[in-house]
């Protein structure tokens, strides 16, 4: 992509960790789980060789995106971690780290990993950022855009010169084809506002969480359909609530629509059950 390579560093399909490299400066976009962190670091080493990893860009504070950074720091102690100011505060909370530990260990066990060191206390943010801040990463320049909705701390990174957006789950989780899974966990209205903000930008390519770099056709499809995907899901949930359906029934309907193919590979069932239950309560609160 015009001098920039984007490479998949994941070692588990549920991970989200992608390397952006222009041959001079290397950036890791999200870092994946804690229990896979060392393996992700080894994948990076296999690509960079003796070169250093310059930056870690974190889109939000969830364990499957951010926890791996603590492990990667063991391999690359000079790397600069960039995350939203809100996320930087979350990393200081003992309760948040305890939740990360529990969720990471639970999924690790499902993947056959039962014994590994938890490094949550080593989470850090070197460069806390807010809307409009600019990160000059060598010759690559990224502007920060706040994208709340999935979490309060969700952000995106825009390289305007390349028309490249490093996206957030607030916009939806994409399977690369025709399915965009809504994922608003703190605010439906904020998610829609974030989507509308992105639609106004000149975006040619998207690096999508849990998927990777989209080609131009995929990018256009995603930009054209991300809003309707979130709105349609909200309206279906609202109708189900008004029809008297239980949360379990609504979750089952949601999974019947979205939990297939690639999405099923990257989205554990207990996670989609939990997240959909949260979305149901958001819709109940915001739209009823």
State where each predicted segment sits:
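A short helix->loop->beta-strand "cap" motif at the edges of active sites that frequently abuts
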Residues: 25, 76-79, 203
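Active-site HxH/HxHxD metal-binding segment of metal-dependent hydrolases
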Residues: 37-38, 45-130, 134
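Short acidic-hydrophobic surface loop/beta-edge motif
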Residues: 20, 133-137
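Residue-level marker for buried hydrophobic side chains located in beta-strands
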Residues: 27-29, 57, 81, 164-166, ...
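Conserved beta-strand hairpin/beta-sheet module of binuclear metal-dependent hydrolase folds
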Residues: 1-48, 156-168
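C-terminal regulatory/interaction regions
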Residues: 236-288
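Short, electropositive alpha-helical surface patch
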Residues: 217-234
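Metallo-beta-lactamase
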Residues: 33-35, 141-148, 152-222
């Amino acid at each position: 992509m015009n001098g920039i390579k984007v490479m998949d560093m994941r070692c588990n399909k549920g991970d989200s960790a992608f390397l952006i490299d222009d041959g001079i400066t290397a950036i890791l976009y999200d870092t994946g789980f804690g229990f896979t962190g060392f393996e992700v670091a080894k994948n990076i080493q296999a690509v960079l060789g003796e070169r250093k990893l310059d930056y870690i860009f974190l889109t939000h504070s969830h364990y499957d995106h951010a926890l791996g950074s603590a492990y990667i720091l063991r391999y690359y102690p000079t790397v600069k971690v960039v995350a939203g100011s809100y996320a930087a505060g979350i990393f200081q909370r003992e309760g948040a780290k305890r939740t990360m530990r529990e969720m990471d260990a639970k999924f690790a066990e499902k993947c056959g990993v039962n014994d590994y060191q938890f490094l949550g206390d080593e989470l850090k943010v070197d460069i806390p950022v807010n809307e409009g801040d600019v990160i000059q990463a060598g010759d690559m320049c990224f502007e920060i855009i706040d994208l709340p909705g999935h979490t309060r701390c969700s952000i995106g990174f825009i390289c305007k010169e390349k028309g490249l957006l490093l996206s957030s789950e607030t916009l939806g989780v994409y399977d690369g084809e025709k399915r965009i899974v809504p994922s608003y966990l703190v605010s439906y209205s904020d998610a829609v506002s974030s989507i509308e903000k992105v639609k106004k930008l000149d975006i040619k390519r998207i690096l999508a969480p849990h998927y990777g770099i989209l080609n131009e056709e995929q990018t256009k499809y995603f930009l054209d359909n991300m809003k309707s995907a979130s709105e349609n899901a909200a309206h279906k949930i609202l109708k189900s609530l008004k029809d008297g359906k239980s949360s379990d029934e609504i979750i089952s309907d949601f999974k019947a629509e979205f939990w297939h193919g690639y999405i099923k590979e990257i989205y554990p069932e207990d996670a989609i059950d939990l997240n959909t239950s949260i979305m149901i309560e958001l819709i109940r609160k915001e739209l009823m």
